[in-house]
């Protein structure tokens, strides 16, 4: 029926978002050769916000956007955009700082722990999660563990910072889930990246030495990360989450790790080990299992 098709549209958008983010790992690793972390983050976020402005203008002209008309609605839109921008900034910055003290593999795995944090946090708010979705989460976690090749688990500064990043991403998913029906998705995405870009820019000027020539030398990775990963990928997340429950959304978004390995292999010619391949298969299986339609009601909330 119609409900199913809406769900598939939502899931499809989240899947596309995960693909776009997976390829962004390649752009980020190339970008880091030229730019310091906050400079790169500021460039991609501000570009992402700017790219969405003409989209908003066209949507307004065609009358397809959920434009806030009243002052109350405008205030709500700005407030939520600001909140999401601060959360995204915290998540990305914690991940970036964590990478100074831990390996990319561990960082990837610890970041993806949001897939277990989302249903756990949901329980606190009285949200029911279907039993097989828990199975999906466990399958995906085992897969991500294999994929990231993290063996020893000492908890140092890097690991704790990256766990903070996972908590921030979990908050972002839950906030989007809460507000998705109340605001225009593209406007929200644009506002959150403007906020995240400005905060990153302040940090760049405080702790780094941003140079125009370096930014221009890095235009391809910034262009991809800004236009596709920030501008398009996160907008897909916001729109997709309107039709998908948060735990399933987080599982679909965790495919980002699988795609990053695949694109690393395709573009950067990185080797794919049998263990990583098994990890990819387990994450895919977990996501497929989460798609089993069930009789459980769509998210019951207790107020």
Feature annotation, model-predicted:
Residues 43, 107-113, 176-197, 230-266:
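Helix-helix packing/entry segments at the starts of transmembrane helices
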Residues 52, 129-149, 169, 200, ...:
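Hydrophobic transmembrane alpha-helices of multi-pass small-molecule transport proteins
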């Amino acid at each position: 029926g119609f409900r199913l098709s809406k769900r598939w549209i939502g899931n499809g958008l989240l899947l596309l978002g995960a693909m776009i983010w997976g390829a962004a790992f390649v752009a980020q690793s190339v970008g880091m050769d030229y730019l310091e972390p906050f400079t790169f983050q500021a460039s991609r976020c501000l570009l992402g916000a700017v790219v969405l402005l003409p989209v908003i203008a066209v949507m307004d002209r065609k009358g397809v956007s959920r434009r806030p008309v009243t002052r109350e609605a405008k205030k709500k839109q700005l407030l939520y955009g600001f909140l999401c921008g601060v959360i995204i900034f915290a998540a990305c910055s914690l991940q970036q700082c964590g990478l100074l003290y831990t390996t990319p593999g561990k960082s990837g795995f610890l970041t993806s722990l949001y897939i277990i944090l989302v249903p756990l946090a949901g329980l606190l708010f009285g949200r029911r999660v279907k039993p097989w979705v828990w199975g999906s989460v466990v399958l995906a976690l085992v897969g991500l563990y294999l994929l990231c090749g993290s063996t020893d688990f000492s908890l140092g500064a890097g690991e704790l910072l990256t766990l903070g990043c996972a908590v921030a991403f979990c908050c972002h998913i839950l906030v989007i889930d809460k507000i998705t029906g109340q605001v225009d998705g593209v406007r929200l995405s644009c506002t959150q990246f403007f906020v995240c870009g400005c905060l990153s820019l302040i940090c760049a000027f405080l702790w780094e030495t941003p140079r125009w020539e370096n930014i221009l030398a890095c235009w391809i990775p910034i262009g991809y990360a800004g236009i596709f990963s920030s501008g398009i990928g996160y907008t897909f997340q916001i729109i997709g989450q309107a039709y998908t429950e948060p735990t399933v959304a987080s599982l679909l978004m965790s495919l980002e790790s699988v795609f990053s390995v695949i694109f690393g292999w395709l573009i950067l010619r990185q080797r794919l080990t049998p263990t990583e391949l098994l990890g990819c298969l387990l994450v895919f299986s977990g996501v497929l299992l989460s798609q089993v339609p069930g009789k459980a009601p769509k998210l019951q909330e207790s107020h």
